[in-house]
Amino acid sequence: MEIPKFLFITVIAIGLSGSLTWANPLANPEAEATAEAGPEAEAVAEAVGEAEPLLPLIPILASLIAAIKSG
């Protein structure tokens, strides 16, 4: 199965943009406010932080599934 060039470029671009967003130190500008809000807010912020790296995988997987079905 041959992967179209645009699909390959799209997957790389989405992956890079996601990793750049995670590495940005300004990604969580309200870190001090979260710490002051209490343990519940810290638990929610931690859960969101753990789930965030999975979000860019959704369009990548969708595009790969579409490529497999069309090919």
From Swiss-Prot:
Propeptide span(s): 24-53
Any one cellular-component term (Gene Ontology): extracellular region
Tissues expressing the protein: Expressed by the venom gland.
Signal peptide: 1-23
Keywords: Amidation, Ion channel impairing toxin, Neurotoxin, Secreted, Signal, Toxin, Voltage-gated sodium channel impairing toxin
Any one GO MF annotation of this record: toxin activity
Compartment annotation: Secreted
Domain of life: Eukaryota
Record-listed Serine amide modification sites: S70
Remaining remarks: Negative results: does not exhibit hemolytic and cytotoxic activities on HEK293 cells.
Free-text function comment from the UniProt entry: Toxin that causes a rapid paralysis when intrathoracically injected into insects (blowflies). Does not cause spontaneous nocifensive behaviors by intraplantar injection in mice.
Protein name, UniProt field: Myrmicitoxin(1)-Pm4a
